[in-house]
Amino acid sequence: MKYVAYSREDETFSEFLDQLKKQGPDVSLVSAQFSDLDDTRCRLVLDCLLDLWGQVASQPSMYGRSMPGVRYLDFSSNHIQSFQASGLVQILNNNRLLSALEIQANELGKAGTEDIRAFACAMKHCSLRRLNITANRLGDAGLATFIDHLPDTGTSLLALHLSVNTFSTDTGSWKAAHSIARFLSSPKKCRGLKSIHLNGNHFGWEGVRAIAHAISGSRRACEATASSLVDLPPSILDAC
């Protein structure tokens, strides 16, 4: 398994791109953490990866053998603001190779709810098993938009990380909490999901209660870590 990582201390951004191209389609993990990646630079990296994925897709008999393709992508702790401008939406289109996408601690959400909606809708075209959007700036409306526009028939996700994405308001993140509750109540939309991480969001007691009811009422084995869901008093699950 080949691993390619970008370090600003050891190489320039151009050298990193050249290294990716030279390694070819046998690279399986790419990391560019704490690299000051903005939308433009992220797009340049992803354009390079699209070419590598295309090389693997042109020879399907080589999947997992001499040309595994990039399966794990980590762009954590950067300055990415837009799912579309950065190329994150485009890389999901018919991508059956990428299985883990780590984009926590960026600035995603700044481009607005339509940008978030485009990313959520693109989830039906890929085979992602793990998606980490922790500590971005989706906000209440943005988080609700993401959840509401995930495909009705479900995704391939096993783990979904959405912690620390909403901000304290007078009413709490009520819209996001109810969208999450509806999502967890749908056997189709959350099919296959093993864990969803929601801690650090400002759902308020009413929001937490709605999510807790959805979890307790669902027959799916879904492990959840959510704000205030540790050691919940039994009364929180009482009928409304």
Q: Could you describe each region identified by the protein language model?
A:
Residues 1-240:
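Leucine-rich tandem repeat or coiled-coil scaffolds
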